[in-house]
A protein has these predicted regions:
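Short alpha-helical segments that sit at the start of domains
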Residues: 1-27
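Short acidic, hydrophobic short linear motifs in intrinsically disordered regions
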Residues: 28-39
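Short amphipathic alpha-helical interaction segments
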Residues: 44-60
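Beta-hairpin "wing" of winged helix-turn-helix
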Residues: 59-70, 76
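Basic, amphipathic "hinge/linker" alpha-helix immediately C-terminal to the N-terminal HTH DNA-binding motif
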Residues: 71-88
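Amphipathic alpha-helical dimerization/coiled-coil segments
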Residues: 83-99
Length: 99
């Protein structure tokens, strides 16, 4: 695999939590729409099973809250999740400056 393809894979499908936390930072997100929203906003189509796994882990660890929206399972990023997202942004920004 070419280096750029490996890099793109690692920062997209390899780090789905970043995209999930970002989606839920401003509003409730219906879980069933997560894959579609990631595709629309970030331009790649993640694996549905991986999305479910990431949602489960982020909820259990307190980074996402369990919500209901239009009678469907939904989530919203918690304060803990927002702090983690900001830490990731800061780290990425510092790394890009060094590159």
């Amino acid at each position: 695999m070419e280096p750029i393809k490996r890099y793109i894979e690692s920062v997209t499908n390899g780090n789905l939590w970043i995209y999930v936390l970002s989606l839920g930072k401003e509003r409730e997100v219906i879980e069933a729409e997560t894959t579609k929203l990631i595709f629309e906003k970030f331009g790649f189509l993640p694996n549905e099973l991986m999305i479910k796994t990431v949602l489960f882990r982020l909820k259990n660890d307190g980074y996402l809250s369990r919500e209901r929206f239009k009678s469907q399972k939904a989530f919203k990023t918690t304060e803990k999740g927002l702090k983690e997202l900001e830490a990731m942004k800061s780290y990425s920004s510092n790394l890009i400056q060094k590159l």
